[in-house]
């Protein structure tokens, strides 16, 4: 029995879940918006906001942690350059989740997650 479940399991083993969230985080930072299921969007929000907070911090250690998580190294450098001017006065809430219509095949609740 899992009390106080802090991360959604997304019906995947831990390694697949981590790879999925890393890929979605990389895509969201690159594209600015991603269409996915509502549960994945909510899990993705935590990881993306953590990466943007690291970018706002701007230290070498924070940059190395972000490089270890985000798949594209050039994307990390551009994130660290733009994060302070884009999110400098904002304390969290860097993403927005907008619900959309259900997916046709399996009626899953879909959502668009985008950077504010």
UniProtKB/Swiss-Prot annotation:
Q: Which GO terms describe its biological process?
A: translation
Q: Which InterPro entries match?
A: Ribosomal_bL17 (IPR000456), Ribosomal_bL17_sf (IPR036373)
Q: Which UniProt keywords apply?
A: Ribonucleoprotein, Ribosomal protein
State the NCBIfam families in the record.
L17
Give disulfide pairs as residue numbers.
none
- Summary of subunit composition and partner proteins: Part of the 50S ribosomal subunit. Contacts protein L32.
Q: Which organism does this sequence originate in? A: Prochlorococcus marinus (strain MIT 9515)
Mind listing the GO molecular function terms for this protein? Answer: structural constituent of ribosome
Membership in a protein family: Belongs to the bacterial ribosomal protein bL17 family.
Instruction: Write down what this protein is called.
Output: Large ribosomal subunit protein bL17
Q: Does the keyword Transmembrane apply?
A: no
């Amino acid at each position: 029995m899992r009390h106080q479940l802090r991360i959604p399991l997304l019906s995947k083993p831990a390694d697949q879940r981590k790879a999925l969230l890393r890929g979605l985080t990389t895509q969201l930072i690159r594209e600015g918006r991603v269409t996915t299921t509502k549960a994945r969007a909510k899990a993705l929000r935590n990881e993306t906001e953590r990466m943007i907070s690291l970018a706002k911090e701007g230290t070498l250690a924070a940059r190395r942690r972000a490089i270890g998580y985000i798949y594209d190294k050039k994307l990390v450098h551009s994130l660290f350059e733009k994060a302070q001017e884009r999110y400098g006065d904002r304390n969290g809430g860097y993403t927005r989740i907008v619900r959309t219509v259900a997916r046709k095949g399996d009626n899953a609740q879909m959502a668009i997650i985008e950077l504010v």
